[in-house]
């Protein structure tokens, strides 16, 4: 990286200018300048399963880590899929546990798991006696083996191998990531424990799990290694948290629908949360909070294209970000819209409360609520099917909307993240010109929500992307 230069004023009567250079690790000052503290940069790099699927990808991770000396803390997932027909190690471990519950041998599955890690060890030229680790785990398996204890072993083995490959210290996540009895992260205790264990050293720690007060292993939900990376960055006051995956950042649209969508250069924490809420699957839902609390930027990058900057997520407001009127799109499909009408509905909070309670009573999952003049619009989906949806609509009518409830099924919601209201008319025109009617629009800042027929969702998304 080309040296950046910055001038500081020396605290003296002469107010001379002192020039400092940034070398990628920290600020370097002239020898006679002692009035500034040099801060060494720290990057926490988390690598997902797709980046760790085989020995070749392990070696690629080593190149990435070695290319920046600030990457002194590494968090790893279990080995992912090597190709489309392959299985993630975590999926195989879940299957092993299911076999144990029904007292069926999981030996064949275990051999597949063992072969993956032995191949990685051999392909990387490592010496770790991984067979001993695998044998010890298998020997401990019984029908009483805890699910979390078993499925966490993928991350554990990945971290053991990566620590040897990088010549970093292995730090077990169970030794620092603390949960309470209800499974909530104990932030202060976890941060203090990692600070003590890391103590300025280069470390590798497994993602996805920690330890309960009882000593038992506890995992996050799937994708939880993202959370571990964020917690490690927050604990150590990192300058940057990197999340390495197989895509070049957060894409502006679903690549299975839009051909070669561009990555988004910058998102604020709030913008990322908004896109996640409306269906963009980027990070584990709990991964942003620790970084946001510490104001630590998150960089999402691709191990396949490490030269690309990826997407940066940070504390700056959208006004300070690279400007684009239409930034990106996300959405949900398989929704229904219920529209209840009643005079004075918007002035009766108790009726709104009862209306939403009625929908929840029938098992509806609410996606979005908009209250207008004498009208309540709810976007929701019913896990129990159409009959439950219409039963919920009838209960809503009885509870809060005697003037009627209209139900429209088979809808999709397209959410457009925008920076500037002037883009709205252009976006709506593009979708309508593509022959897609918009049944409802609502501003859910910083996104505009547009309800379309589910069968036309992909057409609407392509038209919206072309309107950027």
Task: Describe the role of every protein-language-model region.
Residues 2-3, 7-20, 32, 38:
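Acidic, Ala/Val/Gly-enriched low-complexity intrinsically disordered segments
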Residues 22-24, 29-283, 288, 451-456:
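Nucleotide/pyrophosphate-binding catalytic subdomain
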Residues 42-43, 71-74, 168-169, 201-204, ...:
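Structural motif
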Residues 174, 301-305:
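Acidic carboxylate-rich catalytic motifs and surrounding loops in phosphoryl-/glycosyl-chemistry enzymes
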Residues 284, 295-302:
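Acidic/polar loop patches that form or flank catalytic/metal-binding clefts of enzymes
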Residues 309-468:
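A conserved regulatory-domain signal marking ACT and ACT-like small-molecule sensing domains
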């Amino acid at each position: 990286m080309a040296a950046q230069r910055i001038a500081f004023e020396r605290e003296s009567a002469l107010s001379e200018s002192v020039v400092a250079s940034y070398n990628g690790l920290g600020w370097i000052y002239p020898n006679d300048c002692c009035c500034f503290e040099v801060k060494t940069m720290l990057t926490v790099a988390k690598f997902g399963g797709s980046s760790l699927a085989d020995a070749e990808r392990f070696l690629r991770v080593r190149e990435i880590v070695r290319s920046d000396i600030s990457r002194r803390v590494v968090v790893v997932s279990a080995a992912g899929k090597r190709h489309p027909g392959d299985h993630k190690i975590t999926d195989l471990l879940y299957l092993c546990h299911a076999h144990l519950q029904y007292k069926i041998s999981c030996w064949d599955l275990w051999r597949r798991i063992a072969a993956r890690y032995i191949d990685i060890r051999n392909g990387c030229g490592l010496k770790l006696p991984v067979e001993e680790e695998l044998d010890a785990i298998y020997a401990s398996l019984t029908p009483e083996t805890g699910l979390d204890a078993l499925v966490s072993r993928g991350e554990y083995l990945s971290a053991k191998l990566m620590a040897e490959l990088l010549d970093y210290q292995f730090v077990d996540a169970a030794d620092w990531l603390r949960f309470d009895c209800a499974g909530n992260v104990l932030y202060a205790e976890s941060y203090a424990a990692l600070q003590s264990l890391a103590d300025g050293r280069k470390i590798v720690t497994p993602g996805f799990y920690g330890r309960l007060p009882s000593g038992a292993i506890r995992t996050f939900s799937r994708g939880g290694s993202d959370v571990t990376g964020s917690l490690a960055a927050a604990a150590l006051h990192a300058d940057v948290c990197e999340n390495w995956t197989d895509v070049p950042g957060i894409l502006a649209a679903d690549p299975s629908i839009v051909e070669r969508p561009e990555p988004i250069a910058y998102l604020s924490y709030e913008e990322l949360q908004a896109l996640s809420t409306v269906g963009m699957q980027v990070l584990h839902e709990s991964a942003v909070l620790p970084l946001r609390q510490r104001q630590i930027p998150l960089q999402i990058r691709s191990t396949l294209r490490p030269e690309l900057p990826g997407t940066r997520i940070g504390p700056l407001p959208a006004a300070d970000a690279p400007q684009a009127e239409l930034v990106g799109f996300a959405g949900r499909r398989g929704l229904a819209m219920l529209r209840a009408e009643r005079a004075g509905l918007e002035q009766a909070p108790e009726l709104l409360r009862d209306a939403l309670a009625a929908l929840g009573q029938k098992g509806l999952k609410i996606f979005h609520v908009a209250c207008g003049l004498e009208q309540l619009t709810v976007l929701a989906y019913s896990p129990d099917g159409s009959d439950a949806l219409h039963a919920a609509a009838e209960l809503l009518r009885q509870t809060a909307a005697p003037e009627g409830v209209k139900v429209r099924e088979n809808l999709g919601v397209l959410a457009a993240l925008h920076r500037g209201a002037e883009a709205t008319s252009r976006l709506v025109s593009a979708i309508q010109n593509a022959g897609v009617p918009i049944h409802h629009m609502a501003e859910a800042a910083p996104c505009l929500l547009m309800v379309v027929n589910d069968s036309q969702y992909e057409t609407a998304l392509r038209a919206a992307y072309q309107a950027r």
